[in-house]
């Protein structure tokens, strides 16, 4: 921050926070939090306040834990209890027994030249004491869990440091870049937008039109804010490419890099992209997971796109996910599972030793490894392709979901006898579908709508199935377990669930 004191650090709807102002805010908040404040909850809103909170917590030696204020109250309470949170920045997610620390203010240069908010104060001019160590947690994020309770992943500072250095190089960031902050601040993708940008002297741009649901507004915003780097969920990019192709448009001239990730890229959309793009925009396909700190593999698709002009992709082809970044070790097991090792691997799942032992291990050299659950293949040139999951997990809107978590919640409803949840594709988008056998005496006709309301009161929106179908029975395996895939094949073939209650997923926001 000291290298570029008067350059724009954060731009929000045209208003600018300089690196000097951002530094004052961060230092002031760090002093208010005190030394090593532990896990600190933050209401994850799409504003500069959340960016300041993230950096201030890290500067204080604490661990950032984002909580969406829109989550059901019980979900928020369970999350804070699971991580032992005793401090929150701002009152948006405060619970009984949680200390609330208010954000400092600062002067912000607005579009009309006036100044807004109050001064950070004298505390902001003092350097915060050193409170960091490589194994100290940097942030905690939740992934889907089969018990119905989300699993808190603990990411250490060494993982952030190694990953951010690699990403700055991968993206080719300079102080002249303007990077859109698109991802939800609840999900780890936001860190690959925020941290490489602000450690590289570039400008981070937040704007409500990024999530307006209108592609024309989105594209106008990109041009107005002179965005050079876009990091988008693959599902959102699929829809954007369709819009550009249908309207005969191209991305604004200011865009130089587009990063996609979160789920498999559709070869048909890449063919559309190849027809639209002249090679001006660099397109990176990326792979990673919360447990391995953001992006671990990436590939510049210029080469594959050029090859596809001679031999177009077929429907069954798989788009490569690339090679490991410099800080990442990789192994492929005999059954084809990808294992990630090195400094980017998380500490594990907080308070869940069995789940941690199942996924994480350490070799004789002291290298920490994570079993991804993803099956991969390696091409002769060393590039990996994703071949699917080895377990039942599925991605919805770019967010990894364990269907068993949704099943656990649905099974808690008094009208449900049995349930199977699986992932599928509806109208070209990844989605969850649920098949429910009602208890005797339950009102089957209204159960689907009742269950949708029941879930919305308990889980985030991405865990609510797009389709809930009431069925007389589920398919079982030879051992008597519910066969999710078999139940889906049976009831989708019968046309079940095509009527009321079907709902397509929203565009992916990570």
Sequence positions of predicted segments:
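AMP-dependent adenylate-forming
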Residues: 1-17, 88-130, 138-141, 160, 282-285, 300-510
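Conserved pre-ATP/AMP-binding loop-to-beta segment of ANL
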Residues: 124-142, 149, 173-179, 185, ...
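Conserved AMP-binding/adenylate-forming core of the ANL superfamily
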Residues: 6-34, 77, 155-161
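Conserved AMP-binding/adenylate-forming
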Residues: 15, 32-69, 178-183
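Conserved AMP-binding/adenylation subdomain of ANL enzymes
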Residues: 151-178, 188-228
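Gly/Ser/Thr-rich phosphate-binding loop
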Residues: 202, 231, 243-315
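Conserved AMP-binding
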Residues: 44-49, 68, 173, 183-190, ...
């Amino acid at each position: 921050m000291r290298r570029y004191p008067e350059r724009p650090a954060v731009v929000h709807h045209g208003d600018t926070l300089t690196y000097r102002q951002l530094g004052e805010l961060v230092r002031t908040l760090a002093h208010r939090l005190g030394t090593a404040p532990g896990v600190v909850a933050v209401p994850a809103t799409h504003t500069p306040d959340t960016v300041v909170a993230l950096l201030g917590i890290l500067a204080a030696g604490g661990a950032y834990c984002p909580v969406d204020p829109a989550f059901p109250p019980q979900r928020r309470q369970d999350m804070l209890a699971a991580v032992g949170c005793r401090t929150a920045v701002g009152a948006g997610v405060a619970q009984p027994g949680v200390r609330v620390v208010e954000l400092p203010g600062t002067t912000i240069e607005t579009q009309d030249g006036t100044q807004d908010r109050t001064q950070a104060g004298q505390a902001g001019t003092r350097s915060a004491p050193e409170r960091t160590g490589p194994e100290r947690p940097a942030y905690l994020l939740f992934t889907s869990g089969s018990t119905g309770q989300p699993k808190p992943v603990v990411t250490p500072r060494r993982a952030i440091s190694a990953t951010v250095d690699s990403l700055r190089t991968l993206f080719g960031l300079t102080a002249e870049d303007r990077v859109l902050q698109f991802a939800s601040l609840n999900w780890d993708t936001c860190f690959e937008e925020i941290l490489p940008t602000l450690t590289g002297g570039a400008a981070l741009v937040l704007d409500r039109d990024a999530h307006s649901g209108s592609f024309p507004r989105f594209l106008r915003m990109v041009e107005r804010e002179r965005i050079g780097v876009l990091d988008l969920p693959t599902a959102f990019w699929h829809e954007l490419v369709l819009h550009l192709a249908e309207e005969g448009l191209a991305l604004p001239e200011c865009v130089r890099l587009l990063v996609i990730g979160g789920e498999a890229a559709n070869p048909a959309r890449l063919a559309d992209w190849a027809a639209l793009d002249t090679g001006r925009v660099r397109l990176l396909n990326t792979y990673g997971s919360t447990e391995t700190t953001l992006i671990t593999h990436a590939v510049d698709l210029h080469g594959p796109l050029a090859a596809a002009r001679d031999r177009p992709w077929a429907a069954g082809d798989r788009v490569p996910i690339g090679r490991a970044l410099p800080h990442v070790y990789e192994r492929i097991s005999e059954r084809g599972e990808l294992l990630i090792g090195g400094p980017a691997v998380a500490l594990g799942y907080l308070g869940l030793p069995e789940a941690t032992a199942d996924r994480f291990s350490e070799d004789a050299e002291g290298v920490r490894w994570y079993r991804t659950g993803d099956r991969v293949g390696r091409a002769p040139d060393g590039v990996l392709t994703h071949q699917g999951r080895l377990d039942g997990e599925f991605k919805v809107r770019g967010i990894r979901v364990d269907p068993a978590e949704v099943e656990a919640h649905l099974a808690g409803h008094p009208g449900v006898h049995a349930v199977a949840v699986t992932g599928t594709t509806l109208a070209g988008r990844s989605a969850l579908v649920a098949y429910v056998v009602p208890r005797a005496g339950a009102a089957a006709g209204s159960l689907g709508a009742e269950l949708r309301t029941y879930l919305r009161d308990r889980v985030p929106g991405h865990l609510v199935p797009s389709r809930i179908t009431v069925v007389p029975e589920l398919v079982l395996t030879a051992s008597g377990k519910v066969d999710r895939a078999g139940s889906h094949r049976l009831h989708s073939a019968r046309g079940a669930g095509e009527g009321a209650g079907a709902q397509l997923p929203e565009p992916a926001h990570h």
